[in-house]
């Protein structure tokens, strides 16, 4: 899931809710998809951090030899 796509959907949802004063965003489906969206971002960031850490460890290991 791409972040920009995800946040655009959320912004569109909030905008639609304000425009028509209909609780689209607070519906179960949308809140679940938003949760999944935030979760995917969290996983992406944590994966990137661990990947960078592994790379730095890898390089330092071979430089010390």
From Swiss-Prot:
GO CC aspect terms: host cell membrane; membrane
The UniProt record lists the keyword Lipid metabolism:
no
Enumerate the Cytoplasmic topological stretches.
1-20
Q: Where in the cell is it found?
A: Host membrane
Q: Supply the alphabetized keyword list.
A: Host membrane, Membrane, Transmembrane, Transmembrane helix
Membrane keyword on record: yes
Extracellular-side stretches of the chain, per the record, are: 44-65
Instruction: Using the UniProt record, give the first listed, main subcellular location.
Output: host cell
Q: Which residues cross the membrane?
A: 21-43
Topology in the lipid bilayer is annotated as: Single-pass membrane protein
Name of the protein: Uncharacterized protein ORF65
Organism this protein belongs to: Acidianus filamentous virus 2 (isolate Italy/Pozzuoli) (AFV-2)
